[in-house]
Every structure is written in C-alpha cells, then in structure tokens.
Amino acid sequence: MTQAELAPSLNTLDFDKKPEETRVVVAMSGGVDSSVVAGLLKQQGYDVLGITLQLYDHGAAVHRAGSCCAGQDIDDARRVCETLGIPHYVLDYEKRFRETVINPFAESYVAGETPIPCVSCNQTVKFADLLATAKELGADALATGHYIRSGRNPSPENPGRRALFRPADADRDQSYFLFATTQEQIDYLRFPLGGLPKAETRRLAEEMGLVVAKKADSQDICFVPQGKYSDVITKLKPNAALAGEIVHLDGRVLGTHEGILHFTIGQRRGIGIATGEPLYVVFLDARSRRVIVGPKEALETHRVYLRDVNWLGDETLAEAAAGKGFACYAKVRSTRAPAPAVLHIDATGTYVDLTVGEAGIAPGQACALYSAPGDNARVFGGGFIERSEREPSAEACLKALLASPVAA
C-alpha cells in the first residue's frame, strides 16, 4: 500500500466537513512521531499548523539525545515544517513549564514521592495551554504524536462525546501517561498514530523525507541534563539532600544516607548498607528524613488509595463504584499490561484493589484504569497514588515505626 493510499485510512478526524475546511494544530516536539502526524494530516488535505513549545533551555539538556522541546528540537520541527510546506510557530512556555512541571516535580521528591512529570506536562502545558492556543487560532482540533487511540464514545448514554482506547502498538502504549486527560480535552484532541506500530511511523518518516526519521525517541524526563534528576532537585530544593537515617522496619537503625531524593520505593541496589540479607526501600519518611527498608515481601501491595481522580466512565464515579465496586483493569506501571482490579469509594477514600499484588508501588505514581486487558481496551481514567497498603504484618510495623519519636 502506498503512502497516499495509507494516509486516509489512518485518521479521518471524525469531522463532518471536508479536510481542506478543517484546521488542525499539531503539537510538534521535534521528534519523529509528531512530525509524521503533521505529514499525514497534510497529505489528507487538512489545513495544518505546527506549533512547538520551548519548555526549557538549560545547558546539557538542550542537546542531549532524547530530549524534547529544547533548542535542537525546535530547529528540527522548523525544518520538518519547511519540508511539508506548513506554517510553524514557536511559543515560549519556559516560565509556565517551570511553574507547573519542574517545580512540582522537585516538591514531590522532597515529599518522598516518585512523580511522573509527563502527566503534569500533559495536564497543564500541552492539553490546557496549547489546546487553548489552538482554539484561539480557529483550529478544529489539536493533534499529537501520542500512541493512544480516540474515537466516538460507543455508549448511547454519551452521544457526541469521544473516548480513549489503548493503541494498536502495545509496546508504545502511552495511555498510562494520559489518564488525566479530561473529557473536554478528549473531545478536541486527535491521535493519528493510535493505529500504527512505531516501525511504520519511522518508515513513513523516511518516505516523507523528514530529517528526523532516524532521530532517537524522547526520554521520560526530558528536562533533566544527562538524566540526573537529583541535580535538578538539589538545585531547586536543597533540603532534599539533607542526611538522615536508614531504618529497618523492625526499628533498627542500619546507617545513614545523603538525602531521600536518591531513593525510590522498591530500590535494592545502592542503598549503602551491608546486613547480610537482601533489603529493599519500603517507605520514604520525608518528615523525619528516614529511608525505611525491609524484606521483599514487605513491598507486596494489593490496595492503592488515589487522589486527583479523573473519571472517564459513562456513569458518575460514585455510581460506577457503588456496592461491590467497579470491576476493571489497572496499570500501576507504564510498562505493565492492565491487570484485574476493582475500584471502590467509601469513607476511607477512593481506592483500587489489585487482584494480583504489585511490589514497589510509590506515592506520586499513577494508577490508570481500563475496560479490558487488550489493545482495544477503553481508558476509564485513573488517579495519582496517594498511599498503598502492604500485607498486614508489614503495614503494622510501618505504622508503629512512623508513630515512634525520632532521635534529634
């Protein structure tokens, strides 16, 4: 099948008017995915505008392989737009990105969490600010290079609305990072790559003659020089590097550390103690600057409590989770397939019971919810993990330890 024959089948955008009468803004990071989106939509006849956000500009991160939305990437996006013959605009969002993504990222680490800055970026800069700009430009849609599908809501209860679904390429599934996308945003957004494998995206980039066809994929934390997030956090929040104790779940002080920012839940290597038994980071007590460690079984988690829940079901969240709860599938890691779970709401909060236990779940991470485990699963939203419950004995030890006084 030729490129011209393939393009119309990839994305009709579901508009009731001709492509040439439809304006689409493409969020262009300077990478291969968003560049191919722009190329496909141009081929289909849409009125395409490319917009790149300058999000940061600090030293090594600008030219680091796998960065995005910095100096070299902006130039790449410009060159792609020249090749395609579409307008390209650059918007300076550096201050906004620092306030809504970088600073909260550092604050989350200080609080003992393991944050996901990509979700914050999608929530604020991309799907709020850029989306608003697209509307101001008279665009009918904002298209991105994310690997996720959207389509008309299959439920008769919500006619005219759109829904999110996992992509065809499960290895590139980005739905975990998009759980917080609101219904209003989903109705306006389009994801042309949802039905494509990554290999086909790169082939199309080569066929289109795009300079970014062989460019490396962006990394999860794009704004961190050399991938050393601790350097960014220490600069913004020096107290995150304050020393503290490494304590066993049973209360024994095993050693000291140089800052909780160097640890994450589930970590085994690099803890800095030798006890003759394998120990893992079980909890980060930010208040007392303690790194709490224990055996692997102390990491086993079957229940996670959520905050800032974004619900995308057809019923209200309260209706869906009433009674015995809402049977669904959940992902607590971006690389895992959705596993059976039940969503509940009661006086203790909103929580998800995981049928299969997970180890190393950290506060600040996400729990995304789905209708099924397969590629065609609908995305029901999700929430940020506020806390998790371990097996009873480990939970009891942790609560006792956190309630005990800490030596000055």
UniProtKB/Swiss-Prot annotation:
Binding site for ATP: A27, M28, S29, G30, G31, V32, D33, S34, L53, G145
The keyword Nucleotide-binding is assigned to this record: yes
Function: Catalyzes the 2-thiolation of uridine at the wobble position (U34) of tRNA, leading to the formation of s(2)U34.
Protein known as: tRNA-specific 2-thiouridylase MnmA
Substrates-to-products reaction catalysed: S-sulfanyl-L-cysteinyl-[protein] + uridine(34) in tRNA + AH2 + ATP = 2-thiouridine(34) in tRNA + L-cysteinyl-[protein] + A + AMP + diphosphate + H(+)
Residue numbers spanned by region Interaction with tRNA: 172-174
Site entry: Interaction with tRNA: H146, Q365
Pfam families registered for this protein in UniProt: tRNA_Me_trans (PF03054), tRNA_Me_trans_C (PF20258), tRNA_Me_trans_M (PF20259)
Protein family membership: Belongs to the MnmA/TRMU family.
